[in-house]
Amino acid sequence: MAVDPRKVLPTKINLIRLRRELAMLRRIRRVMEEKREVILHYITSMAAEYVRYQREVYSELERIYQNYYLGVAAEGIERARAFTAPAEGSLEVDVSTRTLFAVKTPVFSLREETVPPLPLPAGSDPKLVQSILDMRSILDKLLKLAEYEETLQRLISELKDTQRLINALDYVILPSYQNAIKFIKLVLEDRMREDFVRLKIIKRKMEAKTQ
């Protein structure tokens, strides 16, 4: 998008065209700056929300694992492993998207039918049973946490792209247009001066002939 003054014909038409394009680019820059500020505000707000939610989920996970290890200690490793063996395998997640400031961000939802049922024999240690049930219930929160992380990464990437565009406008594109306009104006002004001098010379010659 940058303009090389040496490759632009110094004409009035090009001067008008470049001025119009420069005005349009300045409007684009203002829009980009507004977009940058909105994204930055949203990232700041979401980052704070993410940190709060992460602490909540990690605290809950810590409690679940504490109960799990206590339950394993009570039941024995082999018996506890027999409880969780049916859960081995892959869970499936549906991924959709939503748009924030022209940025596509993910929405994760667990496919319930892919979550295997866990056998919990009567008489099992209560802490082990509770930890297994809680682990199942926290899956949605873990997906929500992953949503936060991926959304923040995409917004930060968009922020960087927006800033790069603003920098390109500020340091390359806009200056090139300004220099091209300045160059054309100087050439046109020189031509006007030359035409003025030429007309004066012609006028003097014509006056000399009439005398």
From Swiss-Prot:
Q: Which domain of life is it from?
A: Archaea
Question: What is the recorded membrane topology of this protein?
Answer: Peripheral membrane protein
GO CC entries: plasma membrane
Q: Which GO terms describe its biological process?
A: proton motive force-driven plasma membrane ATP synthesis
Cell location: Cell membrane
Can you provide one Gene Ontology molecular function annotated for this UniProt record? ATP binding
This protein's major location comes to: membrane
Instruction: State the family it belongs to.
Output: Belongs to the V-ATPase D subunit family.
Per the entry, what this protein does is: Component of the A-type ATP synthase that produces ATP from ADP in the presence of a proton gradient across the membrane.
Q: How does it assemble?
A: Has multiple subunits with at least A(3), B(3), C, D, E, F, H, I and proteolipid K(x).
This chain belongs to the protein called A-type ATP synthase subunit D
What is the species of this protein? Answer: Aeropyrum pernix (strain ATCC 700893 / DSM 11879 / JCM 9820 / NBRC 100138 / K1)
